[in-house]
A protein has these predicted regions:
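Long, well-ordered core segments of solenoidal/helical folds
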Residues: 20-39, 74-92, 125-144, 184-210, ...
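Acidic Gly/Asp/Thr-rich repetitive segments characteristic of extracellular carbohydrate-active
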Residues: 407-454
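Right-handed parallel beta-helix
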Residues: 474, 479, 499-510, 525-538, ...
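CBM-like carbohydrate-recognition segments
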Residues: 6-10, 21-54, 66-78, 82-108, ...
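Asp-box/WD-like beta-propeller blade repeats and closely related beta-sheet repeat scaffolds
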Residues: 122-162, 509, 516-541
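Oxyanion-binding "anion nests"
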Residues: 238-287, 291
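Extracellular beta-strand-rich solenoid/capping regions of secreted or surface-exposed proteins
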Residues: 442-450, 462-478, 486-504, 510-527, ...
């Protein structure tokens, strides 16, 4: 993501597309109220290393990852750079204070380091410096962190969030391999011991704090417990759980322990909520008591923890209706529309603590004595996180408009239309077909850094020695510049994880020579991808799989002849691809002679960690041609959103089912039992190639075909799902002709593509699998290289 500065220059002048969702609206509102981040939390421009600002800015960065808000990233970065110098020295930070609150704000420096790398080394230095505090943080005899040096022997629930998400993320990123298990065990112990020591058996809740010494005036001299369960303290506990679980390995014994604790909250907290609004009280264990009030920050913390727990699978779907009902109730109760277009969060407790100079004794009257304010950072941050969960779950999207900006190239369409590629950068000329990484090779140019465009002075086959991974952003590969027959990549896969990549007029024909099980081409965890006029075939897994990515277009490609009974460990696996993502366009592509997955639409189990927030949403599948599938054409799409518009489906000699089913809206227990949502319009089903008998002599039944058409009409969504750049579609028969004329590396089609196009047009298959005997669906590239 080192390209953020470049994107900033492009996008800050742009208008917006669509209505801003609540997460973005709250960020905009906060930035309007606070000209820079030193004004957040009522600081009035005063610099302070404080957890409240760090918490809110962390949520800003998370929203920026979903919605691409470079000006917001700069807002965060300005504060981060103000608070720490290039040596990583933090303004007025003293390790000797051993204040766990001072650990929390360092989390944003992980994200900034990911974005800017070693361009600014302060980000890594800050996290290293804060990590040193944990090593010597004083602890109770049972191993929990003291809350502060000035609060000796005290464990506050607040401290769970202040220290443990940072501790867990640092351990995952940088912890010594041989120590990780024990470090994660220590993190889990902080929760389990802290929960045991703060638990109130009378209510099933957890008290705000515990004093191991039993000497503080605010604690019970027998138990060491404070007087009440405070709403926000319990909220800190809840969100600490879901944040730490992001980093704790699933096979670590502590993972199940923390999931159990989260589910315990779901079991007990609803009993203490207001029965009418569903929200929680400032003094959590005294709902409805005179003077007590429904408090926003604790309520949104619980809602965020439950929403995230539901998405991550920590919480059973049986609780889905209850959890999904909470967020709208919160909006109704606590979010106010302001006359200037901003929004505000009401009824936030300004602060809550125990002891100290204020002699805070933690009784009911104390908690009610603290000021009630609006837009408290401690509520705004969790509100943005909860909103992101809600927006991703309901496919609520928003895009900065790129109208007026240069497009990738003439003819670029769809959501990847504005990919920058290597524009304005260095030209690398490929002069050798070798794959040793030396200057003049494709690998050397791909692995270079900075904006770059790759052209070719040679033609022929590049036999990869290992996968070609495109990790560095701002890259254009122009296969059409090669002389003669062009460029074909063989033996290993090409895999893209970089933003702003354009690939045009290449052939990827994997084959079995290397004995690898792989896709020929794939992409994950990237944005602004454009794949144009490529020919992709002979893969031993899927030919081409694109999902878990965003703002992309795959257009005018041929995806053909995935090898079926080949080297795949599962056996027959001649699959076209898995396609999905968020705000992506697949148009004018040809699928031919693939046994299944033409394509398979994605499902949620293909996404991990927080990818569903950023990389899953609307998919457009428009004006594509699918020919001679074996088992299935399109299927899947569980829990997704798809526009399937004016495609052309042509069963061939290997197609088993001729009853008009070209889209199987399927579910399974291993993926999800919730069907995807589809807008289905204008698709064609052409039986002319099999009218006199297809696979095993089967003939199409027109009544079944008609019934299938009625089914698609009935299950279709009434409106097309929105994307940033909707495709201008054409009628399916016209698209069919255009695809056959122009798809693939068509500037100079090779014999393979020419044969494929001829077979699609004639409704035939010249070759068959040498093992399976399926017409057109081959088992080895040698089945056609005769």
């Amino acid at each position: 993501m080192k390209q953020l500065l470049f994107i900033l220059a492009m996008l800050t002048v742009a208008t917006v597309y669509g209505q801003e969702p609540y997460s973005v609206r709250m960020i905009r509102s906060e930035m309007q109220r606070n000209p820079d981040a030193t004004h957040l939390d009522g600081r009035g421009g005063e610099r302070k290393w404080n957890y409240t600002t760090g918490l809110e800015l962390k949520s800003f960065l998370d929203a920026s990852r979903r919605y691409e808000l470079p000006e917001v990233v700069e807002y965060v970065r300005a504060w981060a750079d103000t608070m720490a110098n290039e040596k990583g020295e933090i303004y007025k930070y003293k390790k000797s204070n051993y204040n766990v609150d001072h650990i929390c704000p360092a989390r944003i420096y992980f994200d900034l380091h990911d974005m800017y790398g070693d361009q600014d080394k302060r980000y890594r230095r800050v996290t290293r410096k804060i990590r040193e505090q944990i090593d010597s943080q004083p602890r109770t005899q049972s191993g929990e962190f003291w809350h502060k040096q000035i609060y000796p022997h005290q464990v506050w629930l607040d401290g769970f969030y202040m220290a443990l998400p940072f501790y867990a993320e640092y351990t995952k990123r940088y912890g010594p391999k041989e120590q990780k298990d024990s470090l994660f065990a220590d993190i889990v112990h902080q929760f389990t011991a802290g929960a045991e020591n703060t638990f109130d058996p009378a209510t099933g809740l957890f008290r705000h704090a515990w004093d191991e010494s039993r000497s503080m005036f605010w604690c019970d001299p027998q138990t060491g417990l404070s007087a009440h369960a405070w709403g926000r303290a319990t909220g800190w506990y809840a969100i600490a759980l879901v944040e730490v679980l992001d980093y704790l390995p699933k096979d670590h014994p502590g993972h199940a322990v923390l999931v159990e604790q989260l589910n315990y909250f779901l079991q007990v907290l609803p009993k203490w909520a207001d029965p009418e609004t569903g929200m929680w009280y400032q003094v959590l264990d005294c709902p409805g008591r005179e003077g007590n009030y429904q408090e926003a920050t604790c309520s949104i913390m619980f809602i965020y923890a439950f929403l995230k727990g539901l998405r991550m699978g920590y919480i059973d779907r049986a609780h889905e209706d209850y959890i999904l009902g909470l967020y709208p109730k919160f909006i109704d109760r606590f979010i106010r529309e302001n006359a200037d277009g901003t929004i505000s969060m009401t009824d936030c407790c300004a602060v809550g603590g125990l002891g100290g100079k204020q002699m805070r004794k933690g009784d009911f009257d104390y908690y009610l004595s603290e000021p009630i304010i609006e837009n408290d950072c401690k509520g705004v941050g969790p509100f943005i996180w909860a909103s992101l969960e809600w927006e991703a779950r309901h496919n609520i999207d928003w895009f900065p408009s790129r109208e007026g900006l240069p497009i990738a190239f003439e003819g670029a369409e769809g959501c990847g239309k504005y990919s920058v590629g290597g524009r304005g950068g260095k030209e690398y000329v490929v002069t050798s077909l070798a794959d040793d990484g030396s200057e003049g090779t494709l690998r050397h140019a791909v692995e270079a850094e900075g904006p770059r465009t790759i052209t070719f002075d040679v033609s022929g086959d590049i036999h990869l020695r290992e996968p070609l991974n495109i990790r560095n952003p701002y890259l254009t590969i122009l296969g059409q510049t090669a002389p003669g027959k062009g460029i074909t990549i063989r033996d290993h896969n090409v895999f893209i994880t970089a933003d702003h990549v354009i690939i045009r007029y290449l052939r990827m024909r994997l084959g079995t020579a290397a004995g690898v099980e792989a896709d020929a081409l794939g992409a994950r965890h990237c944005r602004h991808l454009m794949i144009d006029h490529c020919s992709i075939s002979w893969a031993t897994d899927e030919n081409a799989s694109f999902y878990n990515f965003a703002d992309a277009t795959i257009q005018w490609c041929i995806i053909s002849e995935a090898l079926n009974a080949s080297v795949h460990h599962k056996g027959r696996h001649g699959y076209g691809g898995i396609w999905g993502g968020r705000n992506v366009s697949f148009h004018h592509n040809l699928f031919a002679h693939n046994n299944s997955r033409n394509p398979r639409f994605d499902h949620p189990k293909l996404y991990w960690d927080n990818d569903l927030l950023h990389y899953r949403g609307t998919v457009e599948f428009v004006n594509n041609v699918v020919y001679n599938w074996g088992m299935k054409a399109i299927y899947g799409g569980e829990e997704g959103w798809f526009n399937v518009i004016k495609n052309y489906f042509r069963p061939g000699p290997a197609t088993r089912n001729l009853d008009g089913e070209w889209l199987d809206i399927s579910t399974s227990e291993t993926t999800s039992m919730i069907k995807g949502r589809f807008y289905i319009h204008g698709n064609s089903y052409d039986i002319s190639a099999v009218e006199d008998g297809g696979f095993e002599g089967r003939k199409p039944e027109k009544l079944k075909i008609a019934n299938q058409g009625h089914y698609y009409y009935n299950v279709s969504e009434p409106k097309r799902f929105e994307v940033s750049v909707p495709l201008l579609d054409e009628h399916a028969p016209y698209a069919y002709e255009a695809v056959l004329k122009h798809a693939g590396a068509s500037h100079r089609r090779d014999a393979i593509d020419r044969r494929i196009i001829k077979e699609v047009r004639k409704g035939t298959a010249r070759y068959k699998g040498s093992i399976t005997g399926l017409p057109g669906i081959i088992d080895s590239e040698n089945d056609v290289l005769k």
